[in-house]
Each structure stands twice: as C-alpha cells, then as structure tokens.
Amino acid sequence: MRTLVYVVTGGCGFLGRHIINNLILFESSLKEVRVYDIRIDQWLLDLVEKCNIIKIVPVIGDVRNKSTLDEALRSADVVIHIASINDVAGKFTNDSIMDVNINGTKNVVDSCLYNGVRVLVYTSSYSAVGPNFLGDAMIRGNENTYYQSNHKEAYPLSKQLSEKYILEANGTMSNIGLRLCTCALRPLGVFGEYCPVLETLYRRSYKSRKMYKYADDKVFHSRVYAGNVAWMHILAARNMIENGQHSPLCNNVYYCYDTSPTEHYHDFNMHFFNQLGMDLRNTCLPLWCLRFIANINKGLRVLLSPICSYTPLLNPYTLIKECTTFTIETDKAFKDFGYVPLYTWEESRSKTQLWIRELEAKSSSQKPKS
C-alpha cells in the first residue's frame, strides 16, 4: 500500500536523479516524492508527465531558506538529504560551502523536527574521513578503521561536521512526539550516468583524445555505481521506517560500496573512455613539480577571484586525492540491513558506457560541418 511521502533535497543533481528513479522503481510504499532543489531540470518535468502511479512534486528552494524547507517537509515521512556544494576546484568560496553544507544541514534537521519527520538519511561522503591534508593512505579500511581525519579544505571539513550533527540528532523528539531516526551514508568515488566529473573529463579530452594521470600506478581508489548508492539509501530508509529507534542504522554511519574493481582512478575511468579510442598517458612531470603547479594554481585562483573565476582541476586538494590510496573493504551494510548491490559491475559499466556513447554522439552531431 502506497502511504509514504519522501523528500529528496538536492534531488535534481547526479545522485539525486538516481535516487528518484530507483525510488519510483523499487519502493512499493512510496505515495509521493518531493524533489527539493535550487533548480528544476527538464528530466524531472518529463518524469512528472510520464509517472501516473506516484505523485512527483518539484519544489524550488534552498536549504538555507528555513521557511521554504518547512513547507516542503510538511507531512513527510522520510527525508533524504543530498543537497550540498561538492566543490574541489575552488568555484565556490569557503564561506559559501560551509554555509550550504553545515547551516543547510542544520536547517534540514530543524525542519524534520518541526514537521515530525520519522527518518532522515544523510548523504555524506568518504571525504568526511579522508584523504587528509597529509596524504595518509587508507588501505582496505572500514567504518571502524582509525584514520586521522584532519582537513584544511572546506568541502571535506563541512561533510565531517555535518555528518556529526546528523548523528547527534538521532533520537531527538519532534514537535509531534516522534523520535527522529538518523543515519549517514558515505559514498566512495561515485560513477555512472549523468556523473559531472566523468562528463567534464570527457569534454576536456574530446578533441585531443588524450587523458593524463598524475599519480603512481600503485595508487588505488574504491569506486561505487550511483545506482547502488541510491539502492542503499532506499534500503536504509526502509529499515528505519520499519524498526524506528530499534533499527541498527540509527546514529550509525556506513560506506556505500559494491563490486566495482579497486583500481587507479584514471585506469578505472578508461573502462568507459576506451570505447571512444581515447588514450591514457602518464604525465612526465615529477610529483614535486606537480605540487608546485598545484600551489601556483591555488594562488592564481585567489588573486583572480575579484575579476574572474579561475578553477583549474589541478590544485593541492585534488592532487592529494589523486595521489593517495583510499580503499574500503566492508560488509557492514549487509550485516545491519541486508544491503546487496542491485547492479552488478558489468551492468554498471554497461550503463555508464552507453551514456558516454550518447555524449559522444551528441558532441559529434554538434560539430561544424566543413
């Protein structure tokens, strides 16, 4: 029976799109889903027209706007809070990142308590843990592995602090006498259809057909398909709705994982770009030189910020992320709430390859005719 009302903040983004689609496909109790975002994309409007069984309500709003948020969460059962600024290139100021990611999260918690929301699932990130600014490796870690999470950059620090705030809110009594159930999910390096990072890499390499990697071949990263991240969110919310404060998820954190291979970041991406005849090359520059360039880029970004937006992909933070092994090996989500990846690695790869081919076809059709 369809009785539940979900709200997904940041629902028009990359991961939000996967969560909305999978909610509609696999959550049999879903009656209504409200997609709360600062913009409403055409794909969502198309989905509203096509979907007759479930009510889809687009809501334009900012998580920093408490009154709009309160209205969007009225009578909601579950909130999946994705909305955040995920910026590693320096496009946004540190103050903006902290304001949206921390104060926005506090507003979401307050609105949940004001409206008597039963379940709040927070989309955190592995960046809340690391890599830290020292570049310390995490090798086959899990949720219980000790790691010195010292952050200097605004994004990972904001996710770390927001995650802490979400977990501390678990069990708080709402205005209507219900205790709020909260958990945090940490996706690893997410890939899949509509991934903005993969699209950026494609567009920057479209003409040259060359991609470059900076890190040693022995530097590995864990990756996870967006559809499986979405599935874990759905299972987590379902378990907390069914079990309330007795759910093992309450006040708990989980890495989002699947069976995707653990490889070098760019070697992994070539599973999708090889089909286009793209070539992956090692940079000839030594690490000390890359660090120098990264710091120069950071300085230029600050100097040029009053007159233009200079956001090179290579900066001290992105260099540390690429050059630091960060791998996770866990089955905590399976043990606690029965999570098994919905999509195999082969299916995940195939879906992503198809989307990349669609990007290629679109780019080719827009080429000026000679």
Swiss-Prot record:
GO terms for molecular function: 3-beta-hydroxy-Delta5-steroid dehydrogenase (NAD+) activity; steroid Delta-isomerase activity. Pathway: Lipid metabolism; steroid biosynthesis. It holds the Pfam family 3Beta_HSD. It comes from the Viruses. GO terms for biological process: steroid biosynthetic process. NAD(+) binds at residue 159. SUPFAM superfamilies: NAD(P)-binding Rossmann-fold domains (SSF51735). Keywords: Isomerase, Multifunctional enzyme, NAD, Oxidoreductase, Steroidogenesis. The active site is at 155 (proton acceptor). 3-beta-HSD is a bifunctional enzyme, that catalyzes the oxidative conversion of Delta(5)-ene-3-beta-hydroxy steroid, and the oxidative conversion of ketosteroids. The 3-beta-HSD enzymatic system plays a crucial role in the biosynthesis of all classes of hormonal steroids. The keyword Transmembrane helix does not apply. It catalyses: a 3beta-hydroxy-Delta(5)-steroid + NAD(+) = a 3-oxo-Delta(5)-steroid + NADH + H(+); a 3-oxo-Delta(5)-steroid = a 3-oxo-Delta(4)-steroid. Its EC number is 1.1.1.145, 5.3.3.1. Belongs to the 3-beta-HSD family. It comes from Fowlpox virus (strain NVSL) (FPV). This is 3 beta-hydroxysteroid dehydrogenase/Delta 5-->4-isomerase. InterPro entries: 3Beta_OHSteriod_DH/Estase (IPR002225), NAD(P)-bd_dom_sf (IPR036291), NAD(P)_dehydrat-like (IPR050425). The keyword Nucleus does not apply.
